[in-house]
From Swiss-Prot:
Stated role: Ras proteins bind GDP/GTP and possess intrinsic GTPase activity.
Originating gene: NRAS
Protein name, UniProt field: GTPase NRas
SUPFAM superfamilies, sorted: P-loop containing nucleoside triphosphate hydrolases
EC number(s) per entry: 3.6.5.2
Gene3D superfamilies according to UniProt: P-loop containing nucleotide triphosphate hydrolases (3.40.50.300)
Chain spans, region Hypervariable region: 166-185
Cross-link (Glycyl lysine isopeptide (Lys-Gly) (interchain with G-Cter in ubiquitin)): 170
Subunit record text: Interacts (active GTP-bound form preferentially) with RGS14. Interacts (active GTP-bound form) with RASSF7. Interacts (active GTP-bound form) with both SHOC2 and PP1c (all isoforms) to form a tertiary complex; SHOC2 and PP1c preferably bind M-Ras/MRAS, but they also bind K-Ras/KRAS, N-Ras/NRAS and H-Ras/HRAS.
GO MF annotation: an example: GTPase activity
Proregion span(s): 187-189
């Protein structure tokens, strides 16, 4: 069974834990209890493949920012979550993305931009803005509601698909037959 290490990042109060718990336990947590770090595991079937999701739900509060490098380093893919009723959380996405690129030392990291709380009538982040940001990053954008479950599976499953594409790209680039160990051609005897 293939395992995928997913990390959920975003500002405090955007619903990272609510999204994760909705996926794992199928219920909505409506009280806000700031997370330091929680880990969840769930076996799911995505596109006919049984896989194990190892999800790290992270702290959004600034006082825990020193921990971010470590969990960004270990994650294969990241859900970058903002709340559609919180413009600051949307602006913060760029800071998270820059930190991810720095920690991973790469511009090519599997990510999905997630606009949470789409069930709320008080929107301050326009869907078009979010689509444009995701397009500029070259990543998918999905609106979700942890409360109604809208888009929750889609967000996590899309991230798994992004990781699969990334793995295949890495595999194909290292398996083109021209480069072997340390950049030298291989000879099988």
């Amino acid at each position: 069974m293939t395992e995928y290490k997913l990390v959920v990042v975003g500002a405090g109060g955007v619903g990272k834990s609510a999204l994760t718990i909705q996926l794992i336990q199928n219920h909505f947590v409506d009280e806000y209890d700031p997370t330091i770090e929680d880990s969840y595991r769930k076996q799911v079937v995505i596109d006919g493949e049984t896989c194990l999701l190892d999800i790290l739900d992270t702290a959004g509060q600034e006082e825990y920012s020193a921990m971010r490098d470590q969990y960004m380093r270990t994650g294969e893919g990241l859900l970058c979550v903002f709340a559609i009723n919180n413009s600051k959380s949307f602006a913060d996405i760029n800071l998270y993305r820059e930190q991810i690129k720095r920690v991973k030392d790469s511009d090519d990291v599997p990510m999905v931009l997630v606009g949470n709380k789409c069930d709320l009538p008080t929107r301050t982040v326009d869907t078009k803005q979010a689509h444009e940001l995701a397009k500029s990053y070259g990543i998918p954008f999905i609106e979700t509601s942890a409360k109604t479950r809208q888009g929750v599976e889609d967000a996590f499953y899309t991230l798994v698909r992004e990781i699969r594409q990334y793995r295949m790209k890495k595999l194909n680039s290292s398996d083109d037959g021209t480069q072997g160990c340390m950049g030298l051609p291989c000879v099988v005897m």
